């Protein structure tokens, strides 16, 4: 598989809406400095020794309290495990529970870099349809029967790239179908807490006592991605299998220092207010992007107004290949992520993903204006 180039929003000549990363205004640097100073002032030899493989109580206990309060559903530390973020968690799950040649059910469209993680483990991708928060359960059932998948990978909340959230009925169907078939349900919940109405959905792992659900969370989108701190929520049986991986047993806590820093912020009760600030900033940017899209692409594209997360999924109404158009668009100083990159079969060629996280409202206004002008010229 060809490696996708890592991009940042630091090119002064390009407003790159392909970049799904926070800008500096979304990273609470003062809170991180204060937490770092606190950790430094209270540093002990235990802080920099091998940590518990599942993570230290100083991280897991306040994390459980934060998750319980934010989602209004009880979460206990015993069902949590420290990770280096959702990508590293997904890699761990593949290592622990799959073998080369196994099938993985994935949404179409889905997070394109997850494809590379699955490929690293020699897994076969089997796409199933997702649209406007719904799934075709009959078709999915047939795929499960035919392919006997080891995993089903979903991004239920404010999907990357679609931006939608699965309905309660769709989530219940996924949980039920995976339980009956013995398929592990892997729920990537990186955007779960970025609801613009400040009402976070409960994790999929919190909705069932079934042993087949793993929810993956991260502080990359709600604090800072460079910390590389996240968690897996699952039952004790699955957690023990993950903790039994050789490199976990050998190295102990996956990110001891980072987890203590985040734990300090959680323990001080600061994460809730930091999250609220992030939600408010993102909502303002999403609103401006929606308004600018209406003004500049309203006659040539369709999309849904975002209600959370990082992304807007835009589909051109005329036959056009957004992959082929991208180099021409970038020459004019604006970029996007082509829709086909989010499909294991190359579908969604008329669509594109736009991120409103990496730029302020002025840049978003400027970039969407430029995007609309350029696309109208190219496709007409």
Task: Map each language-model feature to its residues.
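N-terminal small-domain helix-loop-helix segment of the aminotransferase-like
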Residues: 1-85, 92, 267, 335, ...
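Conserved glycine-rich beta-strand-loop-beta hairpin in the small C-terminal domain of fold type I
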Residues: 263, 280-290, 302-315
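Conserved PLP-binding active-site segment of the aspartate aminotransferase-like
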Residues: 234, 313-319, 336-374
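Short amphipathic alpha-helices in soluble, non-transmembrane regions
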Residues: 325-330, 368-372
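Conserved core of the PLP fold type I
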Residues: 46-182, 192-210, 282, 362, ...
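Conserved core segment of the aminotransferase class I/II
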Residues: 206-280
